Amino acid sequence: MQGVPGFNTVPNPNHYDKSIVLDIKPLRSLKPVFPNGNQGPPFVGCPPFGPSSSEYSSFFPFGAQQPTHDTPDLNQTQNTPIPSFVPPLRSYRTPTKTNGPSSSSGTKRGVGRPKGTTSVKKKEKKTVANEPNLDVQVVKKFSSDFDSGISAAEREDGNAYLVSSVLMRFDAVRRRLSQVEFTKSATSKAAGTLMSNGVRTNMKKRVGTVPGIEVGDIFFSRIEMCLVGLHMQTMAGIDYIISKAGSDEESLATSIVSSGRYEGEAQDPESLIYSGQGGNADKNRQASDQKLERGNLALENSLRKGNGVRVVRGEEDAASKTGKIYIYDGLYSISESWVEKGKSGCNTFKYKLVRQPGQPPAFGFWKSVQKWKEGLTTRPGLILPDLTSGAESKPVSLVNDVDEDKGPAYFTYTSSLKYSETFKLTQPVIGCSCSGSCSPGNHNCSCIRKNDGDLPYLNGVILVSRRPVIYECGPTCPCHASCKNRVIQTGLKSRLEVFKTRNRGWGLRSWDSLRAGSFICEYAGEVKDNGNLRGNQEEDAYVFDTSRVFNSFKWNYEPELVDEDPSTEVPEEFNLPSPLLISAKKFGNVARFMNHSCSPNVFWQPVIREGNGESVIHIAFFAMRHIPPMAELTYDYGISPTSEARDESLLHGQRTCLCGSEQCRGSFG
């Protein structure tokens, strides 16, 4: 019909209406079809082989909880109760027992919906939230029946589980958009998508701490902080609320982000000199005096009231040329304010903030690690600067500041697997024919086709999605060693440290911040026959066993949030031809020091690559969520299934668990 915009109507660029969303099917939603012959066939056993002896080097050993502070309750609204279901896990969901009735209303729970949310809500029109300075793209309206799994009350007041879930779902969508669109706008587009679909929490502005966010948590964009309520401004450095006292209204500062790029901002971990907002010169205006309004006025009022202000410190991201990492450094008190002339000659407001006592170190830890890396100070308790003796691409420190132990028991360090039995494809392995590097979207690459048409990594280090198995390029592939599909075979990407724990032996942590999906290491050792290790408790302490029962969790993106057919969702269950058993007692790498946790921050992923005409399985570890420096790296060891306990809920491990998590199941192994 004339005058009615249809599917083939070309809009007038001078009269563009953003309320009209074109129904255009993107190319990334079309799944390519490849011949069955290019798909990887099943595996069978084949004769053993192992790495050369040059890969090994011998290693010889040489002869609290944050208190709660009472703060004035200055929050604007208090009538929304915090949900009673507050799982403490910040990494992934596990099955929980509920006393209430199970949902039987027939309402479909959306993918990634937090368990425990069974309320049925009326369908409501979803729009992008009206956030100040929010730079998000116009996104396509999704189906009105999409269920975010987050109730209205949970959007106002969150908890640790909801914060973890929102951040995990956001980053999963961001990774997928980056994988298929190859643009830098994936972050803002992912944020707009989640906001328009109600995937967020802690929307109620508040003074003081934010439920579910801990001191030391790190973020890789301001939008992440906005989604979980830590700092609602995506551009402005000062966030505030309007507090009502009778008929009077008064603004109070809730949080600030210190980017470290303004003159006078101190780098002291216990105090901060913060510059006010406004008055900056740009292409449309000259510099001017700052005014006592908006955020500046809110900081002045908070100085007078004495309320705590959340402080987020921004630091350069070493892995990105332009990116930043934001560290939540806890609550600060404003001690004084003044006005001084800036470099432009205009008046600038200055505020001194002092960190409140009794909080765990966050930014202070960050600055200490920077000094260790630069060689300005020596790591306390350092035993060896590199226990790998050069076997890894990066040194791995050995540290003990707990007792007099000088090192772990003797073992030979190796950076890869030693196979006594290998897995072989029933058909010959076919490598790619790429020159230089395998490119995203190149469907002529056989290695990419094995990964269902996608390059599994971003920037050669970040895993996009968990898969039944991932295929990497092998020796017969002509692509060079820096190919983005050669990740686990190129060694460590982060500076790691083996350290002595207080009650669990030796552990592993990183000096670098780890973004969700970051490759950490593979599990190196000797591949063993199941029958030779069963019952050997001493050797079992250094065994990785794929046949164990592991807690399930959701990590991948939700297809509905990236405009993909739900039937194309990538399965997260691993698909191995037979159980893989690796012993790291005699031969191993840093992975042998990773402790178990029932609430881990690391997960494992099978990776296959060709070697000498055979397809060999490797076990790679990736960050489950953003991990700050000096946080212990842990994964789920699983529980060995027994004939007496077929029901997973009745499984009991061989060793007592000391992870200390509130979700601790009591045993593992």
From Swiss-Prot:
Pre-SET domain segment(s): 430-491
InterPro entries (UniProt xref): H3-K9-MeTrfase_plant, H3K9_HMTase_SUVAR3-9, Post-SET_dom, Pre-SET_dom, PUA-like_sf, SET_dom, SET_dom_sf, SRA-YDG_sf
Chain positions recorded as Zn(2+) 4 binding sites: C598, C657, C659, C664
MF terms (GO), sorted A to Z: double-stranded methylated DNA binding; histone methyltransferase activity; zinc ion binding
Protein name as annotated: Histone-lysine N-methyltransferase, H3 lysine-9 specific SUVH3
Described function: Histone methyltransferase. Methylates 'Lys-9' of histone H3. H3 'Lys-9' methylation represents a specific tag for epigenetic transcriptional repression.
Record's comment describing the protein's domains: Although the SET domain contains the active site of enzymatic activity, both pre-SET and post-SET domains are required for methyltransferase activity.
Organism of origin: Arabidopsis thaliana
UniProt enzyme class: transferase
Positions of region (Disordered): 56-127, 270-290
Skewed-composition ranges (Polar residues): 65-82, 93-107
Keyword Membrane (UniProt): no
Gene3D superfamilies linked: SET domain, SRA-YDG
Domain SET: 494-638
GO cellular component, one term: nucleus
Chain positions recorded as S-adenosyl-L-methionine binding sites: R504, G505, W506, D540, Y542, R592, N595, H596
Tissue: Expressed in leaves stems and flowers.
Alphabetical UniProt keywords: Centromere, Chromatin regulator, Chromosome, DNA-binding, Metal-binding, Methyltransferase, Nucleus, S-adenosyl-L-methionine, Transferase, Zinc
Stretches assigned to the YDG domain: 208-355
Similarity remark: Belongs to the class V-like SAM-binding methyltransferase superfamily. Histone-lysine methyltransferase family. Suvar3-9 subfamily.
Sites where the protein binds Zn(2+) 2: C432, C447, C473, C477
Amino acids binding Zn(2+) 3: C438, C473, C479, C483
Chief location: nucleus
Residue numbers binding Zn(2+) 1: C432, C434, C438, C445
Localization annotation: Nucleus; Chromosome, Centromere
Domain annotation Post-SET: ranges: 653-669
Gene that this polypeptide is encoded by: SUVH3
Keyword S-adenosyl-L-methionine: yes
